[in-house]
Amino acid sequence: VTVDIVVPDANNLTLVDRAMTAQFDQILKNYCRIWRATGPFNHSKLMAIDGCWAYVGSSNLDPRSLRLNFEVDLEVLDRDFAEALEKRIDRTIETASAVTLEGLRNRPFVVRLLERILWLGSPYL
């Protein structure tokens, strides 16, 4: 199983980005890959699985957004659509930079500490 997560390289909300980054090490340790996408800020939430199932929506893919927030999401069970979405995601990854455990560990301690503190407030961000 390959799980690729693509997030913006430059987030429009710095505090949210810092809180999100605090959890990257846990994701990478569980054999997922994280990519920082370059270019204009992209706020889309997309998911494609095995070229046969797709998800497009406004909600973040977390329990709070999926249960508590008023969002619009669409599940698509169409092979052509899912394959096209996978190709779009793959094109984004081609120009993205990989986030690595080594890169995360090499950041200054004060940055890592700040991110962990902000992560504590992430349910409110």
Model regions: which residues?
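PLD/PLD-like phosphodiesterase catalytic module centered on the HKD motif
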Residues: 1-125
